[in-house]
Amino acid sequence: MNNQNVDDHNLLLISQLYPNVYTPLVPQQGGEAKPTRRRKRKSKSVVVAEEGENEGNGWFRKRKLSDEQVRMLEISFEDDHKLESERKDRLASELGLDPRQVAVWFQNRRARWKNKRVEDEYTKLKNAYETTVVEKCRLDSEVIHLKEQLYEAEREIQRLAKRVEGTLSNSPISSSVTIEANHTTPFFGDYDIGFDGEADENLLYSPDYIDGLDWMSQFM
């Protein structure tokens, strides 16, 4: 029994000195063995995540720019939206920034600039559309008004035409014109004019118009 106690004591001492090498089973009062609790080691993914958070916190502190640095970057961005490697290094050196920080700032600034262009274009198209809709409504209203005027003008023309027709049918002038049109105008055959030797006495000639009758000589 003494030897067993010594062995257990030695194993317990070894497990305490080297917990990762050997984990003994410590007997409990009921005779059941209970494994000792080992400390969990962090996985590589957890370690990398923590390191990334630490680096991210440091990078966040580096991203804070002064008003003068932002103003100089804005001026450089207005000159050219693209950022070449040489220009990036030069700006970083002049402003005392990290080249990667300058590149990230330009990338974010270009994204905001593109979004602003899209918003401006959308606003312009929206205003043009609204103006077109208003103009279309105005033209539609004008067309309706012109159609009403045309309809009233056609009705007025019809009323005037009926009035003129009724006036002409009841006018005494039109009746006399109709009677005179039916009366035959007398000519030489209606008069007793002889064509013997006395014909010259019954006809009167005007010397002023004798020359105008030369064209009848071809029929005589």
Swiss-Prot record:
GO cellular component, one term: nucleus
Keywords linked to the UniProt accession: DNA-binding, Homeobox, Nucleus, Stress response, Transcription, Transcription regulation
Principal subcellular localization: nucleus
UniProt-recorded Gene Ontology molecular function terms: DNA binding; DNA-binding transcription factor activity; DNA-binding transcription factor activity, RNA polymerase II-specific
Name by which UniProt lists this protein: Homeobox-leucine zipper protein ATHB-21
Stored SUPFAM superfamilies: Homeodomain-like
InterPro entries: HD, HDZip_class_I_plant, Homeobox_CS, Homeodomain-like_sf, HTH_motif
Organism in which the protein naturally occurs: Arabidopsis thaliana
Keyword Cytoplasm belongs to the record: no
Function: Probable transcription factor.
Cystine pairings recorded for this chain: none
Chain spans, region Disordered: 26-48
Tissue specificity statement from the Swiss-Prot or TrEMBL entry: Widely expressed.
Region Leucine-zipper, residue ranges: 118-146
One Pfam family it belongs to: Homeodomain
Induction record: By abscisic acid (ABA) and by salt stress.
Protein family per UniProt: Belongs to the HD-ZIP homeobox family. Class I subfamily.
DNA-binding region extent: 58-117
Gene: ATHB-21
Location in or out of the cell: Nucleus
